[in-house]
Amino acid sequence: MTGGGTGGHVNPAIAIAETIKLNIPGSEIAFVGTPRGIENKLVRAAGYELYHVDVRGLRRSLSFANIKAAYLALTSPGHAKKIIKSFKPDIVIGTGGYVSWPVLRAAASLGIPSMIHESNAYPGVTTRMLARHVDTILLNFEKTAEYLKPLHPKKMVLVGNPLRSGFFASSEKTASASAGVSDAKEGYQKMILSYGGSLGAQHINEAVLAMMRDYTKYHPEILHILAAGSIEWEDANKMFDAYGLRGYPNLRLVEYIYDMPRRMAAADLVICRAGAMTVSEIAAMR
């Protein structure tokens, strides 16, 4: 499995691995990610071995960092090839993020079956780059095929988005019995979840922190959690303190919500970005 950089790339890979393990208990699964991405926490927490390939995205502005990114784009497939030769997989599956490029490119060059999953309606850069190299392109939206079909019509399969099993609790009552979701509210009458993805979203953080300051701090019966994201974490903490919110036990600022299925099943309101995986998770819950 390969996919990294954000939760939107890592979590579907974990969901696929989870399903493979369920159907083929004796299967061996390893992940390849970057040294810096959230996969280093999520993959290891899920109990899988994680290899590293250093690869970085190009910045749109002129930057010396682009020189290193270009160098890594050229050298990373060789590193990925060594990992693949060592692990000897029967198939390599990617779920996006820059790290999928060298790993799937290396797999294709070695003649190992490969596929990439695209969760968005418009395919990302990595999917477009790999489309002619991989054996199969898995799609969440039928419309995505319009952007790839002229060149790769026989490769595409409409499958939807892979979700971790915890998201298929159809109601709070059902989820409470199966996964202890009732504890997620910690005794509060209502719960609000707010998040802008694993990296964070500045405007969502600012709006939600203002909401905490002006509304939820006056409602101690409401548990309000904001996951600020890794990039926005420092700024969100400064604003949290500036608004004097640190002393309210019902107001929580965290970097990432690691028990999202449990929390989401118990939530009365979710405020979030409309990322493809996030929308799929909410749809599965409701």
Which residues make up each language-model segment?
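Short amphipathic alpha-helix
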Residues: 9-20
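Glycosyltransferases and closely related glycan-assembly transferases
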Residues: 79-92, 100-115, 128-133
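Acidic, amphipathic alpha-helical patches
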Residues: 39, 73, 80, 126-127, ...
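A donor-sugar binding/catalytic signature common to diverse glycosyltransferases
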Residues: 94-95, 260-286
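Glycine-rich phosphate-binding loop signature in dinucleotide/nucleotide-binding domains
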Residues: 24, 82-90, 184-187, 266
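Donor-nucleotide binding loops and adjacent catalytic segments primarily
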Residues: 42, 46, 173-174, 180-270
